[in-house]
């Protein structure tokens, strides 16, 4: 093979298939909090199917289970885990007020 053509060939990378996040024995249910919590973001939002690497049917079942858990108060609708750090409050100094007429 010509040296100039060798530069444009793609290198062979090993392909490793990722394991599916839901096994065949896992039941998608609103009571299975350990499974449901994997598919929720830090803000409490349901992650997309592309991020989760789920099939369409699995994503639908996960979404329904999360919504049921929220309605039954097992899961919060919003996750306020991030507490805002309190910064030192700077007292406002207002000078003497003058009226402009």
Curated annotation (Swiss-Prot):
Record region (Disordered): 1-23
Principal localisation: plastid
A molecular-function term among this protein's GO annotations: small ribosomal subunit rRNA binding
UniProt superkingdom: Eukaryota
Cellular component annotations (GO), alphabetically ordered: chloroplast; mitochondrial small ribosomal subunit
UniProt xrefs under Gene3D superfamilies: Ribosomal protein S18
InterPro entries (alphabetical): Ribosomal_bS18, Ribosomal_bS18_CS, Ribosomal_bS18_sf
SUPFAM superfamilies for the chain: Ribosomal protein S18
One GO-annotated biological process of the protein: translation
Cellular compartments annotated: Plastid, Chloroplast
Start-end of Basic residues biased regions: 1-19
Keywords: Chloroplast, Plastid, Ribonucleoprotein, Ribosomal protein, RNA-binding, rRNA-binding
Protein family per UniProt: Belongs to the bacterial ribosomal protein bS18 family.
PANTHER family documented for this protein: 30S RIBOSOMAL PROTEIN S18, SMALL RIBOSOMAL SUBUNIT PROTEIN BS18M
HAMAP family: Ribosomal_bS18
Subunit-structure text: Part of the 30S ribosomal subunit.
Official protein name in the record: Small ribosomal subunit protein bS18c
Source organism: Liriodendron tulipifera (Tuliptree)
